[in-house]
Amino acid sequence: MAGFKQLSGLVVPLDAANVDTDAIIPKQFLQAITRVGFGKHLFHEWRYLDVDGTKPNPEFVLNYPQYQGATILLARKNLGCGSSREHAPWALADYGFKVMIAPSFADIFYNNSLNNHMLPIRLSEEEVEEIFQWVWANDGKQIHVDLEAMTVTVGDKVYHFELDEFRRHCLLNGLDNIGLTLQHEEKISAYEKNIPAFLR
């Protein structure tokens, strides 16, 4: 898994608070257990005018031409509330989002996002409002996220965010739970060699 250090990307301004996981990925699309293929169902009930997902809703922000190819999602408080389905970050990541910025996230959704190599950034409501205003006024312009410096640069303004150092280390180095375990492979092998035969 590639490490995440910096990203410059377009921002989708989702001007809504309390966006729950059922809105992010509706329950009828949860049958699969692999992480791919969910992006086409992201925000399905808002994004499409029909059940089959063949008629895009032109009034939903994800369908606006100027936000196509965006890699950063901007939202209001309590993003990812509701049920704990891991399919929600799967859908966001499969669509192409790598960073989410909001004043707050539901705890389980926040942790699931980090586990799926996405960066959820908490900023104050005032800072998020400033970024919304900038994005609306600057169609097609990118912002810059620097995980090493823990900053978000929007125009000529720099915002600082916090992230648990362990989580930051994992993202910077592209480590998931398996990767973390393999860092201790030599110690694990040495331990296994010393296990009594009756315990093997």
Curated annotation (Swiss-Prot):
Alphabetical list of InterPro entries matching this protein: 3-IsopropMal_deHydase_ssu, Aconitase/3IPM_dehydase_swvl, AconitaseA/IPMdHydase_ssu_swvl, IPMI_Swivel, LeuD
Job of this protein: Catalyzes the isomerization between 2-isopropylmalate and 3-isopropylmalate, via the formation of 2-isopropylmaleate.
Similarity section: Belongs to the LeuD family. LeuD type 1 subfamily.
Oligomeric and partner information: Heterodimer of LeuC and LeuD.
Listed GO CC annotations: 3-isopropylmalate dehydratase complex
GO biological process: L-leucine biosynthetic process
One Gene Ontology molecular-function label: 3-isopropylmalate dehydratase activity
Gene: leuD
Organism: Haemophilus influenzae (strain 86-028NP)
Reactions it catalyzes: (2R,3S)-3-isopropylmalate = (2S)-2-isopropylmalate
Pathway in which this enzyme or protein is active: Amino-acid biosynthesis; L-leucine biosynthesis; L-leucine from 3-methyl-2-oxobutanoate: step 2/4
Protein name: 3-isopropylmalate dehydratase small subunit
UniProt EC number: 4.2.1.33
UniProt entry keywords in alphabetical sequence: Amino-acid biosynthesis, Branched-chain amino acid biosynthesis, Leucine biosynthesis, Lyase
